[in-house]
Amino acid sequence: LQQFFPALQRTRMIPAFLGPQGSGKTTGERLIGRLLVGQDFDVTGVQREREDALIAAITNRVMVGLDNADSKIPFLPDALARYATSQRYQLRRLYTTNEECSFSPRAILMISSRDPRFNRPDVAERLLPFNFDRPRAYRPEFEIFSELEKHRGAVMGALLGRAAQIADALPEHPPKPLAFRMADFGSFGERVSASLGGGSGSWIELLGRLGKAQSQFASDGDGLVAALAEVHHSENIIEMAVVDLFHKCAAVADAKGFLFPRSCQSFGQRLSTMRRVLEIELGVLFQEKRGHGGLRVVSFIPRNGDDGGDGDAFSEKDYERG
């Protein structure tokens, strides 16, 4: 529904359809695309050396469904992050020496993958991950899409009716500050939830679950997170110098066969990059300071007074502290 309020989504969440081959990811993208723009919609691939093609698509189309983004495409994480923040694309006009042109992203972007390589933490925080499993039985696509066409008018009518109700109610519910990075999405959902009489609690609970799903996506296959989780849970670490933590985690990673940073410097940089993921996965507040002689020290403070072992999502109080 936020798509009907462009002024309230300067930042954009990207639906990500994730799952094994044959789980219906492509069909899911096609269903949403056909619902919103009609039966001519179809998904498109993303090519390793064709960032210009992606820019052209998201600055000209109404909807773009990137399908099977499985291989490592160097520009894709940055492209997703730029799209999510609605950055204008500044390009040199073709066949000129120094003439610039700019384009704004306008499409609703979706992406699907069975082996995502775009799970950088800053990108993961901008995704709406939807996990798919293979069904027990398959239906032909023409049957699925025929059913959609029969009900498309009624569904779109209901969506537009709900959008009108929300537009009338939003002025009565001013936005609140929330501890959720994609503030436009978080604030819009909180205002809608409040306008429906449900209060903020249910929406904030959903944001907590979303944050957990995003952190799991970002940490999937990450040896640093896996090694640090083992060390933290086994030794209940509260505070430790980064160099000592590196050696402990490196020993676990070596024993378990995890991919792990080779140097303490790289380890320290990754700690900073993965800070938000570590907080959610370990259920802690991650803090750092400089000790004697400039030694970098990190702290893992149990959240809400517990031991942080379950890594549960944030509470309503956490989200509203702003």
Pin down the residues of each PLM region.
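Conserved AAA+/SF3 P-loop NTPase catalytic/coupling segment centered on the Walker-B
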Residues: 62-85, 116-125
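Conserved catalytic/switch belt of AAA+ P-loop NTPases
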Residues: 37, 77-101
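AAA+/SF3 P-loop NTPase mechanochemical coupling elements
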Residues: 53-59, 93-112
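Short regulatory helix/loop adjacent to the ATP-binding pocket of P-loop NTPases
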Residues: 114-128, 133, 140-141, 159
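P-loop NTPase catalytic core of nucleic-acid-dependent motor ATPases
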Residues: 1-60
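DNA transaction DNA-binding modules
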Residues: 21, 66, 71-72, 147, ...
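Short glycine-/polar-rich loops that comprise or flank the Walker A/P-loop
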Residues: 39, 60-62, 87-90, 105-108, ...
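Structural recognition of the conserved hydrophobic beta-strand(s) that form the central parallel beta-sheet
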Residues: 65-67, 92, 104-113, 129-130, ...
